[in-house]
Amino acid sequence: MDLALSQDQQAIEDLFTTFFENECPTERVRKAEPLGFDADLWERFAETGASGMGLPESLGGSGTSPLDAALVAESLGRRLAPLPFIEHFVASRLLVRCMGEDPVLGVLAGPKAIATLALHPITRGPAHLVPAGAVASHVLALAKSEVLLCTEDPPGRPAANFAASPL
């Protein structure tokens, strides 16, 4: 059994290692706080085709495997890139499984859309505990027995951080 990366996988790893070395210096990571997101970096990242990795080719994506996404995530993590790639990849794949190859999902391959999942079912009011929720344009959520796709402009501001509050 050969566990080495294929040539295509090695090319993905090399591409994103170089991309993040060039595009994500420490100063850029620091400037992305407290939101933890850099919109300009996301647009550059999307230009590589990475935002469409969770989508089939028919929707403008590349239909790559989770292993390919893991290689991108490893490169992203190595530079602490302030991007919601894993959230977007997982949500994109799940949306395709739920909705099929609906053309409305093609927007997720572009530089302006970010998808994510609500971690808990919505009982009333807005969804809570949504990774990348402050920047996501598409949120997949469960409400009772229905799966909902919520699309609206993200708030663009972080939730209050109570970690440093006095007890």
Please report, for each region that a protein language model flagged, where it lies by residue.
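Predominant activation on well-ordered alpha-helical scaffold segments within soluble catalytic domains
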Residues: 17, 70-74, 89-96, 105
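Catalytic-loop motifs flanking and including active-site residues across diverse enzymes
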Residues: 65-68, 87-91, 135
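Short, surface-exposed linear patches
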Residues: 26-27, 43, 74-77, 95, ...
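FAD-binding core of flavoproteins
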Residues: 93, 101-167
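N-terminal glycine-rich flavin-associated loop
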Residues: 31, 83-100
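Residue-level signal for alpha-helical context at structural boundaries
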Residues: 34, 38, 90-91, 109
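Amphipathic, small/basic residue-rich leader segments at the start of a protein or domain
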Residues: 1-82
